[in-house]
Amino acid sequence: MGFDSPRGRGGGGFRGGRGGGSGFTPRGGGGGFRGGDRGRSPGGFRGGDRGRSSSGFRGGDRGRSPGGFRGDREGGFSPRGRGGGFRGGDRGGFRGGDRGGSPWRGGDRGNFRGGDRGGSPWRGGDRGVANRGRGDFSGGSRGGNKFSPRGGGRGGFTPRGRGGNDFSPRGGRGNFQSRGGGSRVGFSDKRKQYDSDGDDDEEEEVPKKKLATGTPFAKQTKPVEDDSGEDEEDEEESDEEPQPPKKTAKSAIATAAEDSDDDEEDDDEEEEESDDDAPQVKKSVAVEEDEEDEEDEEEIEMDEEDEEEEEDEEETEPVAKTPAVKSSLKSVDSTKGKQVNLSKVATPTTVDKKAPATPHPAKTSKNAAGDVPKLNFDDDSDEEDEEDEEVEEEDEEEEEEEEDVPAKKAPVLKQSLSQIAQAIEEDSDDEDEDEEEEEDEEDEEEEEDTTNVPLIKSKADLLKQIAANRAAASAAQDSDEDEDEEDEEDVEEEDEEEEEEEDIPAVKPKVTEKQGGVKRKLDEPTVASKQVKSDGKSIISEEERRRQDRDSRSLFIKEIAKKAKDAEITGLVTGLDSFRRKKNSNFGWLVFNTVADCKKAHDVLSKSKIQGKALYVDFCLSESKAPKEHGVRPINPLQLFINALPGTCNNTDLKNIFRSSTDIKILHASGQPNSKKRAFITFGTVEDAQAAFAKSNGLKVNNHLVDVFYARHQETKVDVKPKKAATPAVQKKIVPKVAADSSGDDSEEVASSDEGIQEVEEEQPKQKKLVKKVEPKTIPRVQQKKPQFKKTGFKGKK
């Protein structure tokens, strides 16, 4: 549209989206102006563009334009100025005497070097006003100031300094984009690096074909063209007829790298970038030529590049892919490796044969076969959008993998299979640990429900519980000491009856499993209860008679010293059958063989002292009360209860006595191995149980008289029994935890809890009050200790 842009093909000075596009270059004309790229002026046309005048024609054809005086090479205008006024960015405005000759050059690459070797002052990489830290806006390159972090004067605000001056992170995506910063040919790397969009096509073709073939490229050279209007004709012909690309000799390459001393400093920095952008074949040929030859070579190279670009447009337009698509696959730094230095590598022969460019292997599947990519990259946001889309595609793929692997919690980009497996194992381990913790918590909650043991989470809670236990134990002991003789006898008898009722639920299943007809016999006492009631009455009366017989031969004593041993008491009397005393208890019962022995012992013990303390002694028969209480609960017709078994008795001894029994269970009265034992004898039939009960009158086991009674059912105590079981369990489980603090009081607490089971239940509200009173006493102590531990801990860490 107007101005002759070698690659634009319309677009009115804009880089034209590759053949009549909307005026925006897909690779670097992002801001709308190719501005200074390949020597074009900031206005969007090439500033004379090889001699064209500002109106878009070749204005003097290499220097014949109004502003393009060929000058004398010393007078401020480049002798090969190519028109456009002040070289129009073609190698910098005010070439300034060409390498320091003019006052502006100043010999120090100073004021108006004016984009020398790099286009207009806006062109990043020119060595003029904003170039290489010698201008106003150059960043950190060679002491420059202002905004360019990498410096080199390669644009106003680009972090890498690769061209455009509009905040482009990659350079070459902003306005006045120059892919190769610091090159002497407008916006090309090292004067030869940047090849605009046609070069982009070559970037796809050349390296990939080289990888495919693995053969060196054929080298072609082109004779130097004259500075006449032939350039215009050549370029016009090249639009119609593709010509083979041509290259200069190796000596031209060497002279470009070995410039004057001042130029070498600038070139070194440019070479550092060009080395990062593309691997180059370094050749050392020590040849120095005139500066005019260098300019001629540059012009020839630019002509060749333009011709190659035009040929590439005709050849590879249908299948061309923009580097932006490729660059979206890579990071910002990785795209530098995809640039191709066409001046260092010969053009492949396949280009002449019009072979289609090899598409990018990673992205071929994303474009349909018949689709021609129409891309419009205005700025970096387009490229970033593509990168975001690729990241989203990767996320979607990983989310699909997550569906196959439910243990994975969050998508992770670019995660290997080993990492995924590792994450799954960790997650599964975490889930297993969580399940184990939940099971442990459930078990603990069940234990708490059964035992009602409060959780001890801190030292304060432990102290509170200790105080509560001691208060309960002391209350039980006080109540025991204040009891009368009658109450103590009732407690003992009730303990026996309670133990008679134990394990009955476990006995019933065993009986039903072993004998099929037993179930009916068990039901008969409740259904047809005539004989059972008559038997029950006789049983109760028989049990009462046996108790009276036992009590007539027994003495009740109390106020026994806790440290006194049983032998100290039994050694004072004769005819003793058994001494029933709980460990370290201050009371007990002496059972004698005959009533006469009991009376003699009463006289002796009432006058005796144990460890300096007198005993309280009395008969049990006259003190026995409420015989009806023993007949309130229904009996178990299949089970007998035996009390006061000697410590040496075992299951074999009882089995020899009760041969018709089906199950024998021996219990220790107070949980101590050497204490008096109690047993439950289960029979298969009611007749067997009745026969065993009848024969057990005056029964001796290991030469000790024992009491034999019927066991009782638990039906009437279903609601009361759990409370009794819960109270001792609370105290017994907490006492071992306190053992480290008060080992001497353990036995006392256990004994007192067993002795006063019913009293503790009745006085539970009182115990709660005691616990509440103890709390304010224990809390201040714990609060005083905690700060001390913290202070010492901090000191140790410091």
From Swiss-Prot:
Q: Composition bias, kind Gly residues: at what positions?
A: 8-34, 150-164, 171-184
Pfam families, A to Z: RRM_1
Q: Using the record's annotation, list all stretches that form the RRM domain.
A: 638-713
Stretches of Acidic residues bias are at 196-205, 226-242, 258-278, 287-317, 378-404, 424-450, 478-504, 743-762
Note the superkingdom of the native organism.
Answer: Eukaryota
Compositional bias, Polar residues, is annotated for 328-350
Which GO molecular function annotation, any one, does this entry have?
RNA binding
InterPro entries named in the record? Nucleotide-bd_a/b_plait_sf, RBD_domain_sf, RRM_dom, RRM_MRD1_RNA_proc_ribogen
Q: Does the UniProt entry include the keyword Cell wall biogenesis/degradation?
A: no
Q: Where is the composition biased (Basic and acidic residues)?
A: 59-75, 88-98, 106-116, 532-548
The entry's free-text remark on domains says: Arginine-glycine RGG-box region plays a role in sub-nucleolar compartmentalization. Dispensable for nucleolar accumulation.
Q: What does the UniProt function comment say about this protein? A: Nucleolin is the major nucleolar protein of growing eukaryotic cells. It is found associated with intranucleolar chromatin and pre-ribosomal particles. It induces chromatin decondensation by binding to histone H1. It is thought to play a role in pre-rRNA transcription and ribosome assembly. May play a role in the process of transcriptional elongation. Involved in phase separation into sub-nucleolar condensates.
Instruction: Return the protein name.
Output: Nucleolin homolog 1
Q: Which organism's genome codes for this protein?
A: Caenorhabditis elegans
Q: What is the lineage of its organism?
A: Eukaryota, Metazoa, Ecdysozoa, Nematoda, Chromadorea
Question: Encoded by which gene?
Answer: nucl-1
